[in-house]
Amino acid sequence: MINLKIGQKLQLEIERMGINGEGIGVISGRLVFIPYALPGEEVLVEITENARNFSRAKLVKIIEKSPNRVKPQDRAYHEMSQSHIMHLSYPMQLEFKRDVMRQALEKYKPAGWRNYELRATLGMENTLGYRNKLQFQVRRLNDGTVIAGLYQEGTHHLVNLDNCLVQDPKTQEIINHICRLIEKFDLPVYDERKIGGIRTVMVRRSQKTGEVQIIFVTSTPIILDGQVWPELREEPSKRQKNSFVKFDKMLSALTEEFEEIVTVAVNFHPRKTSEIYGERTQVLFNEKETITEGVLDYEFELSPRAFYQLNSEQANVLYGEAVKALNPKKDDRVIDAYCGVGTIGFAVAKKVKSVHGMDITPESIFDAR
């Protein structure tokens, strides 16, 4: 097998795509993974990593371009992740997803896998603005500007996502406004090195009703109507008090600006971990404790922490196909494992004798009931 050196440049033909969306070329029997490269392309690459059985490389130049290559519309595309496939035409993205299933079957070989029929992936008409929920980290830059977004893969660099094209436009508008309010009221923002404050914001919008719920995740207590939450066992120092998040003005300004907001909650997460949420959540504002969402021919309630599919349009397609494939009978008893708020179970509930759901998230079970 050829010995490749870090920094070495070479020309490759891309033979296929890997499960993470990278192009794969082969040189003397050695696999080379190249993000952003597409099958059929002739490319110039630079080796960045060597493992025992494969290498990784960065794309330097496309010598011969694939007819399936398109220009990504999202300006943050190259900053966000090496596994994006927005440079691949949508029909071929659907074909790629089917190929991922084929690769998985060939690798894990479940019983009878050679007889499985891999049908065409069911796509959607509008491929932008479909994500009903965002969960962005928040940071303050040196000039005082507050940004919200996601970390660049493998780094601590937060990419500002102020116009993420796959997000529901209203959720994007709300998170942008929240950033401006944090600046206006000079609220503390989390810094992993020394400063406590707001660290993450979740915004979710019902595609059925347009209702919006928000969760602020903070590393320090908050102050609302003069009360500190969560309650402290001892008197905080002046420095600690300065990092408390004073929510009064923020909450009023936010709910006045967006009448769609029905729930605002805060989650206390003081630990330095990669987990998004802490154990304690407190509702600050609630016209309703939940938002009403719908799928197929039924509606259900979602509390802020409950899980639901990010793509409401495709959830309808997914659940519809699941019901058809299950072909439920009146005497059937169904177990909905990892049920979330019970959406799949509800889809068959009227067609079977009983449905039993189970999940590890108490909020999801509460909503399902």
What are these regions (language model features)?
Residues 195-209:
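Short edge beta-strands and adjacent turn/loop segments
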Residues 1-76, 112:
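Terminal RNA-binding accessory module
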Residues 61-191:
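Extended interfacial segments that mediate partner engagement and assembly in macromolecular machines
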Residues 129-141, 146-152, 203-206, 282-295, ...:
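Short beta-strand elements
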Residues 203, 210-220, 299-303:
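Short, aliphatic-rich beta-strand segments
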Residues 23-28, 149-152, 215-217, 368:
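Short, acidic/hydrophobic/Gly-rich beta-strand patch recurrent on exposed beta strands
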Residues 25, 40, 83, 201, ...:
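Residue-level signal for inorganic ion chemistry
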Residues 2-11, 19, 220-369:
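Rossmann-like S-adenosyl-L-methionine
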